[in-house]
C-alpha cells in the first residue's frame, strides 16, 4: 500500500517569538500516526532500562527445621526442634518464597527493527499534529506545531532567559500546568525515593548535547532536553502516549532529516 504524503511548512521563530522565515519539514512529519507501534516501541525502550533482580538462593532456608511427622494433631510443616516454631515452608513466617524472582527472567520486550523505525517516525509526526498535542493535555497558544526556533536558542545558559523565551512563543502556560500537577505519589513508591510525581512538560530537541541550554533548561520543571541524534519514543511519547509538545531548533531538524528521511522509502 502506498501513502501519498504532503510536506508541511512551518515558521522559524526568533528568541522574541517573531517569524523569521518558513521552512519545509521533512516528509516523515506528515506520516500517519500509528498509536499501536508507538506503544510497542515505547515498551521496548522502557524495558531496556529495567534492572534484573533475584533473591539469595538460601533465603528462608537457613534453619534446621524438619517436620515432626504425623499423628500429633498439628500441621506437618517443618518445625524447629525445641521451640516447635514453624519455618522453611512458604506459608510460614520467615520461610522461603515459593517462586522468587530470578535474574534469568526476560524483561525486555523485543520489537522488530522496521517497527521500531516506524514507531519513532510516528512519534515525530504526532508532535506536528496539534490534535495529538492538545489531546495529551499540553497548554499552548502558538499556532505553529511543532515550534521551531533559531539556533541561537542552544546558547542560552540561564533558566530565567529560557522562561522569557517560552513566554514569548506561547508555551509558558504548559510550565504552569506542570507545576500545578506536582503531588504525592500513591503507594509504597513514596517510601523509596519517589515521593513526588510531576507531569511532563515541553521537550526541547537540540543539535548538540553539549549545548548550554541542556543544563539551563533542566532547571525548569517538566522540561527535558535531548539531542536530535538520541531522541527516541521515550522522549517523544512518555508513557506511550503520542503528541508531546516539542520545540526544535533549526539545526536539529536537519539532523533528523539525515537520520530518518529515506530510511523507510518515504
UniProtKB/Swiss-Prot annotation:
<dbReference type="GO" id="GO:1990904">
    <property type="term" value="C:ribonucleoprotein complex"/>
</dbReference>
<dbReference type="GO" id="GO:0019843">
    <property type="term" value="F:rRNA binding"/>
</dbReference>
<comment type="function">
    <text>One of the primary rRNA binding proteins, this protein initially binds near the 5'-end of the 23S rRNA. It is important during the early stages of 50S assembly. It makes multiple contacts with different domains of the 23S rRNA in the assembled 50S subunit and ribosome.</text>
</comment>
<dbReference type="GO" id="GO:0005840">
    <property type="term" value="C:ribosome"/>
</dbReference>
<keyword id="KW-0694">RNA-binding</keyword>
<dbReference type="InterPro" id="IPR023574">
    <property type="entry name" value="Ribosomal_uL4_dom_sf"/>
</dbReference>
<keyword id="KW-0689">Ribosomal protein</keyword>
<dbReference type="GO" id="GO:0006412">
    <property type="term" value="P:translation"/>
</dbReference>
<comment type="similarity">
    <text>Belongs to the universal ribosomal protein uL4 family.</text>
</comment>
<comment type="function">
    <text>Forms part of the polypeptide exit tunnel.</text>
</comment>
<dbReference type="Pfam" id="PF00573">
    <property type="entry name" value="Ribosomal_L4"/>
</dbReference>
<dbReference type="InterPro" id="IPR002136">
    <property type="entry name" value="Ribosomal_uL4"/>
</dbReference>
<keyword id="KW-0699">rRNA-binding</keyword>
<keyword id="KW-0687">Ribonucleoprotein</keyword>
<protein>
    <recommendedName>
        <fullName>Large ribosomal subunit protein uL4</fullName>
    </recommendedName>
</protein>
<comment type="subunit">
    <text>Part of the 50S ribosomal subunit.</text>
</comment>
<dbReference type="GO" id="GO:0003735">
    <property type="term" value="F:structural constituent of ribosome"/>
</dbReference>
<dbReference type="InterPro" id="IPR019970">
    <property type="entry name" value="Ribosomall_uL4-arc"/>
</dbReference>
<dbReference type="InterPro" id="IPR045240">
    <property type="entry name" value="Ribosomal_uL4_euk/arch"/>
</dbReference>
Amino acid at each position: 500500500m502506498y501513502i501519498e504524503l504532503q510536506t508541511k511548512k512551518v515558521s522559524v521563530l526568533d528568541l522574541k517569538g517573531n517569524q523569521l522565515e518558513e521552512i519545509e519539514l521533512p516528509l516523515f512529519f506528515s506520516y500517519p500516526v500509528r498509536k499501536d507501534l508507538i506503544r510497542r516501541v515505547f515498551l521496548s525502550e522502557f524495558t531496556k532500562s529495567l534492572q534484573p533482580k533475584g533473591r539469595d538462593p538460601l533465603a528462608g532456608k537457613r534453619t534446621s527445621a524438619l517436620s515432626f511427622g504425623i499423628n500429633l494433631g498439628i500441621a506437618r510443616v517443618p518445625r524447629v526442634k525445641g521451640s516447635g516454631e514453624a519455618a522453611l515452608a512458604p506459608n510460614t513466617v520467615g520461610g522461603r518464597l515459593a517462586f522468587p524472582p530470578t535474574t534469568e527472567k526476560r524483561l525486555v520486550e523485543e520489537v522488530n527493527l522496521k517497527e521500531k523505525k516506524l514507531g519513532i517516525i510516528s512519534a515525530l509526526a504526532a508532535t506536528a499534529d496539534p490534535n495529538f498535542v492538545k489531546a495529551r493535555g499540553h497548554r499552548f497558544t502558538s499556532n505553529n506545531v511543532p515550534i521551531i526556533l533559531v539556533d541561537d536558542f542552544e546558547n542560552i545558559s540561564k533558566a530565567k532567559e529560557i522562561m522569557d523565551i517560552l513566554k514569548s512563543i506561547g508555551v509558558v502556560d504548559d510550565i504552569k500546568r506542570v507545576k500545578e500537577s506536582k503531588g504525592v505519589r500513591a503507594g509504597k513508591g513514596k517510601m523509596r525515593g519517589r515521593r513526588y510525581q510531576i507531569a511532563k512538560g515541553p521537550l526541547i530537541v537540540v543539535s548538540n548535547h553539549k549545548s548550554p541550554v541542556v543544563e539551563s533548561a533542566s532547571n525548569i520543571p517538566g522540561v527535558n532536553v535531548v539531542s536530535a541524534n538520541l531522541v527516541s519514543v521515550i522522549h517523544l511519547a512518555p508513557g506511550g502516549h503520542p503528541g508531546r509538545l516539542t520545540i526544535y531548533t533549526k539545526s536539529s531538524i536537519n539532523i533528523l532529516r539525515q537520520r530518518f528521511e529515506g530510511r523507510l522509502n518515504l
